[in-house]
Amino acid sequence: MHALNIFPCGLFSYIALLCLEASIQEESSDLTGSDTLLWCNLDLDCLNNSSCCRSSSSSERPDFLNLESLVSFTFWEPLKFNNISSKNGINSLYSNSSSALITCSGAMVFLASLSAISEAIEDRIIMNSMPELMMISLASLVNIKSWSSISDIIFCTVAKIIQCFL
C-alpha cells in the first residue's frame, strides 16, 4: 500500500526533474553559476548549510536524466531527511524501515517502466521546460501534510504537462 501511495509522486517527480535539468542547461549557457544555485537548493542535506551550496559546482550536480541517480535522489533523500525531521506527515508514510524499503523498491520498478515513455516525450518537454513543476514535486515529497491532498498535486501537474504540448 505504501508503494502505491508514492507512485504518483514518482511520476511527477520524474517529469519535473526532466524539466528542471533542461532549465539548468539553458541557464548555465548564459549565466555562470546559475545551475549551481538551482541544484544545491535540491540537496536536502544542505537545507541549513549555506557553505554546502557555495562548494557545489555543476560538475558535481546529480545527473537527473540518469534513472539510477534520479531514483536515489527522489526517494532516498526524503528518507534521509526524515531521519532529521518527522514534520509534515512524512513520518507517517515512512513509519519504519521495512515500509520504506517496500516503498522505494516499488518506486524504482515504477520509474524503470516510465523510462521508455519519458524518452518519447523528453524532447517536447525540454523545448517547453517548466521549472515550477519541480516545486510541485518537492511539495509532494517534503511539504505535503495530508496524502488526501495528492489529488490537488495530480490535477495541477497534469495541467502543466498539457501546457507543454499546446
Curated annotation (Swiss-Prot):
It is found in: Membrane. GO terms for cellular component: membrane. Its main location: membrane. The chain crosses the membrane at residues 4-24, 101-121, 146-166. The keyword Membrane applies. It is a multi-pass membrane protein. Keywords: Membrane, Transmembrane, Transmembrane helix. Partially overlaps NCB2. This is Putative uncharacterized protein YDR396W. It comes from Saccharomyces cerevisiae (strain ATCC 204508 / S288c).
